Amino acid sequence: MATYAVGDIQGCYRALKLLLKKVKFNADNDHLWVAGDLVNRGPESLKSLRYIKKLGPSATLVLGNHDLHLLAHAYGVRTLNPKDTLAPILTAKDSDELLEWLQAQPLLHYDAEFDAVLVHAGIPPIWSIENALNYALEVEQALSTTQTAAAFFVDMYGNQPDVWQPSLEGTARLRLITNYLTRMRFCSPTGKLELQTKNAPSLPPTGFAPWYTHKHNKWGNTKILFGHWAALMGETRSKQFIGLDTGCVWGGALTMMRLEDGQFFAVDCPC
């Protein structure tokens, strides 16, 4: 029995199947963590979504920004742009079932056995792990009914507010929580977000640094596994912060880590 954590699949179903074959993944005994962005940009988002859903309790998915983007489309808040590859999901015969399942997935997962967190983008240095779990739950509760989810998606998009205040309320609070957990790359020591820059951490915008490089006494030794940042190519220079996005959909590789021993596995992406 083994637990594997995989980076951004983004509709690259063939690469996912090749990687699972490489590690001899057995859904009856093994467990797969998916670091968000299961869909979009790649050619087989529908197959990817169906497969992870079919794994049932053998898979744990946290939502990424592209997954939320799909749900926003489904609620009529956004229209598809030429780069999106989501139309086959929205028109599939099992679309409602797939989207209902996706909407019920968490934004953050903590496993006490491994003392490890799975999140799409990261956790701001001003939050503890407990804070992050509780704040993620606020968004998950907003997604828990059709009425509250519709209101959430209407106001989800935007870069403001860009720094955390416990007094934040309503849609502004939920938007910032979502941006931290699903979009963050660079932030300041006080958690101020910079969401425009997507390049490698060696070229940070002035006053900002990769979120995981700031002082984080509240996290102890908890490992944080994340995706989202393809430009990192998995290099965080830390054993505590595990970057899993190695740019599969951009011609890189699909990467996973076995949590029991920290061993990495990868396949070139035929996406």
Curated annotation (Swiss-Prot):
Pfam families: Metallophos (PF00149). It catalyses: P(1),P(4)-bis(5'-adenosyl) tetraphosphate + H2O = 2 ADP + 2 H(+). This is Bis(5'-nucleosyl)-tetraphosphatase, symmetrical. Its EC number is 3.6.1.41. Keywords: Hydrolase. It comes from the Bacteria. The gene is apaH. It is an enzyme of class 3 (hydrolase). Belongs to the Ap4A hydrolase family. One of its GO terms (molecular function) is bis(5'-nucleosyl)-tetraphosphatase (symmetrical) activity. NCBIfam families: apaH (TIGR00668), PRK00166.1 (NF001204). Hydrolyzes diadenosine 5',5'''-P1,P4-tetraphosphate to yield ADP. HAMAP family: ApaH. The keyword Protein transport does not apply.
